[in-house]
């Protein structure tokens, strides 16, 4: 930091905020510090008196942060920032063609994070067996063993299952899918909201992921599933009822903030410009 001499610092994780506290306390942090909370609810670990501004996911997050002692004038609701490409429309037909998927049939997407963790093979089997006969796409991340296992399955040989490794095309996959099964990380959920893909949150990790799932479920954009069977039931219900699926899509659209990254960048740059003009 001494070498780069920044005009401002933006943190998207609480650990650097904590690390910077001794410098601010010793008056050795002369630039503004901004914090972007990348979950849908506030957590006390983010709260430090030396933060000049918080950028948060929603009005609810802002209220929770205020209740934890942060002055309202230091909180701005922007949404959670993700890659701008998630806000660009690919088109369902084009997205499906990219992965060799059926242009009109149901498609279910299963994601287990970058490491492809969880009972992914069991989830795939349950979804493939549904009466609607969806094509199932499983993103295995860096779990090459899982990808090879799925590729050798009967469902893969008949074209009902596609197993992908780590991919930078999650935006296209979300647009291609009728429903996505995933964990409840703030960024992944924000991406699904922007693409308006109905989300089944599978076994969220206790703590922040559970709170994320509760927020999304209360907004009608997701369903929390505790078991593989619950996942299958929800996916079956949504695939069999396009009207219900469309309601979830509309709810997701209301919660989405596709321009959050640009909005936060603009606000930070404007604040830097104001500070320079005032000579502070």
Predicted features along the sequence, with ranges:
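Active-site and donor-binding regions of nucleotide-sugar-utilizing enzymes
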Residues: 1-69, 74-77, 83
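A short alpha->beta transition loop at the rim of the catalytic pocket in nucleotide-sugar-dependent
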Residues: 177-178, 196-198
